[in-house]
C-alpha cells in the first residue's frame, strides 16, 4: 500500500486564490518585458526586408543595373579612403624632425593670431587696474594726511609680535614735523599673543623714545556692550586669552591725564594710524564698547577717515591702513598681513620662508602630519589633511600654502621678536627733554610700576612660541615725482613694479571726459568684469561713430574746391557739372 501511494501523482488542482495570483504575476511580468523592449529595442535583430521590383515594371533591368553600379561606386570609395589613410599613416611614420618643427611653428602662428585680441584685452585690463590702484594709493595718503592735520594726539598701532617690523619712523617724523604741538603714543596691540616677559622688554625699549602702552582689542561679535577688563584683573593666562578687551582703562586714563595736564577744557582729537589689519578699528570699537567702525580679517576694510566720539573730552579718528615699503618685494607685506593672501600669485616662496623659521617637528605637531623631507611634500600632506583635492585626487598644494600664510597672520603660528640690545650711553634720535615732557603730560610714571608688577606675575609657556628676527622698521619708498608729495607714502594696496601706471593724464574737455561708475572702483564689487565689458562696448561704438563722421568730412573736403574747375566755372551747367555717383 505504501508503494502504491508513492507512485500516485500529485494533483494539479489549485485553489482559486493561488491560481489568480499566479496569473496576475505572469501578466505583470509580460507587461514589464514589453515595456523594457519598447525602451531598448534590439538593433539588427530583424533582417532588412529586401526591396523587390515587380516583374511588370518595364524598366526592371535598368533599375537593377543602376543599383549594382551604385554599390560598386560605394565600395570603390571605401577602398580609396582606406588606401589614403594607409598612405598618410606610412608618411607620418617616417616624419623628420624638421617637418615637426615647421608644423609646430605653423600651429603656434595660428594660435597667436587667434588669441591676439585676448592678449590686448588683458594688457588693457592690467593698465586700468594699475591706474585704479594708483588713484587709491593717493586717496589713502590724503586721508592719512588729514588725520595727522586734524589730530592732537596720534596713536600709532603696532603688532606686539613684531613691533619694529610693523612700525615706521616716517609716521613719527610726520607727527613731529606737523604744525601744532602734536603728541605720539605707541600702542602694542595683540598683547595676548606674546609672552609677558617679551612684552615687558618691548615696553621698556620703547619708553626710551616716548609714551607706550600694551593693549588687547576685543574680539567679541555683538554690536554693543563689548567686554572690558582692567589691568589689575589680568593675573592669569586664561584672562589674557579671552575675547574681552584689556588695556582700555589705562589708555583712556593716559588721554584723560593729557587733557588735564595741558589744561584743555574743550575736547581733543585722537588719530589712530598704522599698517593695514594691525587692529586700528578694533581698538576704537573696544574703547567705545560698540561697533563704531567696520572691522575684518583682510586688509583694506577702512576706506576713508572716520570720526567717532568717545566722550565729551575725546574724539577718535580712524585712518585707512598705510604701508611704507622700500622695494617691489611684497613678501614682508604679506607676512605682516598688509596685503591680502588671496592676491599673492606665488604663495609657495613666502610659505617656505615661514617653514624655514622653525623646526620640522614644530609644524608636524601643529598640523598633525608625519615627517617630511621637502616643502612640496609638506604642502601635499597638509592639503590631504585639510581635505583639499583637485581633479583625479591631486592634493591642492596652493590652498595648503595659502593656509600656512593665513595661520601666520591670524596667530595660529605663534611667534615673537626680541628688542634690540641697547648699550649704555647709546643716543636716541629724540632728545631726553622731549621724552620727559611727554611722559609728564600723559603721567606715564604712575602706570609704569603697575604694568611691570602685573606683567611679572603673569607667566606664560613659551614652548610653542618661536622667536624670529625682526625685519626692522619700514622705510619710505623713493618718490616717483618730486613735485608730488602724495607719492612718498603708499597705501594698503601695493602695486607690482612690472605694471607701470600712467604718469599723467591729458586734459580733456568736460564733454569728452569718460564718466566711470564709482561702484566699479570698489574691490568688493562682484560684477566688475561685466561693467568693464559694458564700458568697452560703449567705447567701441563711440569710436565707430567718430570714424564715420571723420570719413564724411574727408569726402566733403576732397570734393570741395575753392578754384574754378574749368573754363566754364562762371556758368553752371546742370547736365555737365552734376554727376550722380
From Swiss-Prot:
GO CC terms in record: granular component; nucleolus
Residues bearing PTM Phosphoserine: 99
Basic residues bias spans: 1-49
Biased composition (Basic and acidic residues): 500-517
Positions annotated to bind GTP: 189-192, 274-281, 318-321
GO biological process: regulation of cell population proliferation; regulation of multicellular organism growth; ribosomal large subunit biogenesis
Start and end residues of each CP-type G domain: 141-325
SUPFAM superfamilies reported for this sequence: P-loop containing nucleoside triphosphate hydrolases (SSF52540)
Coiled coil (UniProt feature): 64-108
Taxonomy, superkingdom: Eukaryota
Molecular-function annotations in GO: ATP hydrolysis activity; GTP binding; GTPase activity
Phenotypic effect of disruption: Impaired embryonic development resulting in a profoundly reduced rate of larval hatching.
Subcellular locations according to the entry: Nucleus, Nucleolus
Its biological purpose: May play a role in regulating cellular proliferation.
Entry note about domains: In contrast to other GTP-binding proteins, this family is characterized by a circular permutation of the GTPase motifs described by a G4-G1-G3 pattern.
Protein family (similarity comment): Belongs to the TRAFAC class YlqF/YawG GTPase family.
Protein's name in the database: Guanine nucleotide-binding protein-like 3 homolog
Gene: Ns1
Amino acid at each position: 500500500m505504501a508503494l502504491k501511494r508513492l507512485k500516485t501523482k500529485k494533483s494539479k488542482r489549485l485553489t482559486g486564490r493561488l491560481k489568480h495570483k499566479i496569473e496576475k504575476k505572469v501578466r505583470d511580468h509580460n507587461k514589464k518585458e514589453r515595456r523594457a523592449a519598447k525602451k531598448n529595442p534590439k538593433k539588427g535583430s530583424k533582417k532588412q526586408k529586401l526591396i523587390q521590383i515587380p516583374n511588370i515594371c518595364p524598366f526592371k533591368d535598368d533599375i537593377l543595373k543602376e543599383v549594382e553600379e551604385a554599390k560598386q561606386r560605394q565600395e570603390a570609395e571605401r577602398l580609396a579612403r582606406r588606401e589614403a589613410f594607409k598612405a598618410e599613416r606610412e608618411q607620418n611614420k617616417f616624419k623628420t624632425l624638421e617637418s615637426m618643427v615647421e608644423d609646430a611653428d605653423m600651429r603656434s602662428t595660428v594660435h597667436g593670431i587667434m588669441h591676439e585680441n585676448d592678449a590686448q584685452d588683458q594688457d588693457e585690463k592690467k593698465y586700468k587696474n594699475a591706474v585704479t590702484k594708483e588713484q587709491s594709493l593717493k586717496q589713502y595718503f590724503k586721508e592719512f594726511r588729514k588725520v595727522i592735520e586734524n589730530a592732537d594726539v596720534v596713536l600709532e598701532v603696532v603688532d606686539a609680535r613684531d613691533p619694529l617690523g610693523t612700525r615706521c619712523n616716517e609716521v613719527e617724523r610726520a607727527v613731529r614735523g606737523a604744525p601744532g604741538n602734536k603728541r605720539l603714543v605707541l600702542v602694542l596691540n595683540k598683547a595676548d599673543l606674546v609672552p609677558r616677559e617679551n612684552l615687558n622688554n618691548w615696553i621698556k625699549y620703547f619708553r626710551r623714545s616716548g609714551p607706550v602702552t600694551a593693549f588687547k582689542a576685543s574680539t567679541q561679535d555683538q554690536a554693543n556692550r563689548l567686554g572690558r577688563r582692567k589691568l589689575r584683573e589680568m593675573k592669569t593666562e586664561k584672562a589674557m586669552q579671552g575675547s574681552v578687551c584689556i588695556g582700555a582703562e589705562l589708555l583712556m586714563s593716559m588721554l584723560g591725564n593729557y587733557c588735564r595736564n595741558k589744561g584743555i577744557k574743550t575736547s581733543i582729537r585722537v588719530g589712530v594710524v598704522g599698517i593695514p589689519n594691525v587692529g586700528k578699528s578694533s581698538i576704537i570699537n573696544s574703547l567705545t564698547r560698540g561697533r563704531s567702525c567696520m572691522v575684518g580679517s583682510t586688509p583694506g576694510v577702512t576706506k576713508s577717515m572716520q570720526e567717532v566720539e568717545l566722550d565729551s573730552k575725546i574724539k577718535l579718528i580712524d585712518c585707512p591702513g598705510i604701508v611704507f615699503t622700500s622695494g617691489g618685494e611684497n613678501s614682508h607685506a604679506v607676512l605682516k598681513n598688509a596685503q591680502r593672501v588671496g592676491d599673492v600669485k606665488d604663495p609657495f616662496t613666502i610659505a617656505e620662508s615661514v617653514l624655514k623659521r622653525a623646526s620640522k617637528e614644530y609644524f608636524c605637531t601643529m598640523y598633525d602630519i608625519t615627517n617630511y623631507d621637502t616643502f612640496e611634500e609638506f604642502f601635499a600632506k597638509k592639503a590631504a589633511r585639510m581635505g583639499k583635492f583637485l581633479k583625479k585626487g591631486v592634493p591642492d598644494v596652493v590652498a595648503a600654502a595659502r593656509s600656512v600664510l593665513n595661520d601666520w597672520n591670524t596667530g595660529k603660528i605663534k611667534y615673537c621678536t626680541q628688542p634690540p640690545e641697547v648699550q649704555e650711553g647709546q643716543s636716541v634720535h629724540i632728545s631726553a627733554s622731549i621724552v620727559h615732557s611727554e611722559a609728564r603730560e600723559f603721567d606715564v610714571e604712575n602706570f609704569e610700576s603697575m604694568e611691570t608688577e602685573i606683567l611679572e606675575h603673569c607667566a606664560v609657556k613659551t614652548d610653542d612660541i618661536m622667536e624670529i628676527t625682526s625685519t626692522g622698521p619700514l622705510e619710505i619708498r623713493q618718490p616717483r615725482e618730486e613735485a608730488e608729495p602724495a607719492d612718498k607714502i603708499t597705501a594698503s594696496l601695493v602695486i607690482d613694479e612690472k605694471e607701470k601706471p600712467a604718469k599723467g593724464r591729458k586734459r580733456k574737455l568736460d564733454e569728452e571726459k569718460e564718466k566711470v561708475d564709482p561702484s566699479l572702483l570698489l574691490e568688493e564689487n562682484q560684477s566688475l568684469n561685466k561693467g568693464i565689458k559694458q564700458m568697452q562696448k560703449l567705447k567701441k561704438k563711440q569710436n565707430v561713430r567718430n570714424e564715420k563722421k571723420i570719413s564724411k568730412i574727408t569726402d566733403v573736403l576732397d570734393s570741395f574746391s575753392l578754384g574754378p574747375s574749368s573754363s566754364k566755372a562762371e556758368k553752371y551747367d546742370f547736365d555737365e557739372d552734376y554727376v550722380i555717383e
